[in-house]
């Protein structure tokens, strides 16, 4: 979907470059830079001065969670804060026929993964929201050798700042305790990624208005906060500028564009580009072409 975002912004740049004499201000088009690598490329752009003098900022994300032609809007927190953890379970390698002479890091890592699931299930209040996902396990390179170590990598997503601050401690406690109980050790690294995207109330209300004006009131979907992270938060937090971020629907069952993002069969309904450009154009016209 990121190529769709780039296409939308290129269209906006072309459109308003032909209307510069009608703009009562300056329009800056910011293409997303290295969002996938925590802490995200947005903070680098902020440090480079891109946000200097900016009064407000708008963002969007194409989403197969919502039908094409619909806009997901919410006041306040839209996305979770997104962090990464890496764990190295260290054991003692050896021959697979002599496990008693080894400390098996594969079994150790398996127990750590199961233990981590208890954080959300048993150590977090039901009134809080969090997702902890183990997404990579790497270890061993032969069928008959118990390896010396196994690496585990995953992500943590939270909305509460207090809970976010507690997560590294809980992950470390479970990982180190499990490793010690099995005669091994482990190393835990925790990297803070993007903060939550917090939509400004005034701009969010304006977004609802322009969407309703351009596409009809039924195009506005009042959604719940979503768990995927987004480094747009750096523009509003570190950049010190109010912003609004909306979800642009691209789900169309007949076209086969209902697959989730990051699925190998994901396809984008390109009609969503029209709605994305329309949203940006409407917001810019309301602000700069009065």
Model-predicted regions and their roles:
Residues 1-4, 195:
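Extracytoplasmic/periplasmic, Sec-exported soluble proteins
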């Amino acid at each position: 979907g990121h190529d769709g975002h780039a296409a939308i912004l290129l269209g906006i740049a072309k459109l308003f470059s032909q209307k510069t004499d009608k703009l009562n201000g300056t329009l800056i088009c910011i293409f997303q830079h290295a969002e996938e690598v925590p802490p995200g490329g947005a903070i680098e752009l902020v440090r480079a001065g891109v946000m200097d003098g900016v009064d407000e900022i708008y963002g969007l994300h194409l989403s197969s969670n919502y039908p094409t032609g619909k806009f997901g809007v919410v006041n306040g927190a839209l996305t979770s804060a997104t962090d990464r953890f890496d764990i190295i379970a260290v054991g003692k390698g050896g021959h697979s026929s002599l496990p008693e002479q080894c400390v098996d890091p594969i079994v150790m890592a398996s127990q750590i993964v199961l233990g981590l699931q208890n954080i959300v299930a048993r150590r977090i209040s039901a009134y809080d929201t969090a997702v902890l996902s183990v997404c990579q396990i790497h270890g061993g390179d032969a069928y008959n050798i118990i390896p010396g170590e196994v690496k585990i990598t995953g992500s943590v997503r939270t909305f509460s700042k207090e809970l976010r601050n507690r997560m590294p401690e809980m992950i470390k406690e479970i990982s180190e305790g499990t490793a010690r109980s099995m005669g091994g050790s482990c190393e835990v690294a925790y990297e803070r990624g993007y903060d939550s995207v917090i939509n400004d109330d005034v701009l969010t209300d304006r977004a609802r208005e322009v969407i309703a004006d351009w596409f009809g009131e039924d195009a506005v979907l009042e959604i719940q906060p979503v768990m995927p992270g987004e480094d747009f938060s750096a523009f509003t937090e570190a950049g010190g500028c109010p912003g609004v971020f909306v979800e642009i629907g691209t789900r169309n069952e007949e076209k086969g564009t209902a697959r989730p993002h990051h699925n190998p069969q994901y396809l984008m309904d390109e009609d969503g580009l029209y709605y994305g450009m329309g949203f940006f154009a409407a917001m810019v016209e309301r602000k700069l072409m009065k």
